[in-house]
Amino acid sequence: MATQTVEGSSRSRPRRTTTGNLLKPLNSEYGKVAPGWGTTPLMGVAMALFAIFLSIILEIYNSSVLLDGISMS
């Protein structure tokens, strides 16, 4: 027999801690999904703005955008 159950084994029940009690309400909404699109459009706008920001930084780094009054050495 590969597995065996022993009564009174060394397995103990999970302890209740103060931190666990404080974090329990955060996990109570697990698996629930709000109907509709929710904040998806807002996330899309944020991602687009971040992509624009990264492309501007990349252009400055590659010196393809020269800023007036700033010498790139």
From Swiss-Prot:
* Assigned keywords, A-Z: Chloroplast, Membrane, Phosphoprotein, Photosynthesis, Photosystem II, Plastid, Thylakoid, Transmembrane, Transmembrane helix
Q: PTM per UniProt? A: Phosphorylation is a light-dependent reaction catalyzed by a membrane-bound kinase; phosphorylation occurs on Thr residue(s) in the N-terminus of the protein.
Keyword RNA-binding: yes or no?
no
Molecular-function GO terms, alphabetical: phosphate ion binding
Q: Which residues cross the membrane?
A: 41-61
What's the protein's topology in the membrane? Single-pass membrane protein
Which superkingdom, per the lineage?
Answer: Eukaryota
InterPro entries membership:
PSII_PsbH (IPR001056), PSII_PsbH_sf (IPR036863)
Which stretches does the entry tag as region Disordered?
1-21
Q: Which family does it belong to?
A: Belongs to the PsbH family.
Listed name of the protein: Photosystem II reaction center protein H
Origin species: Drimys granadensis
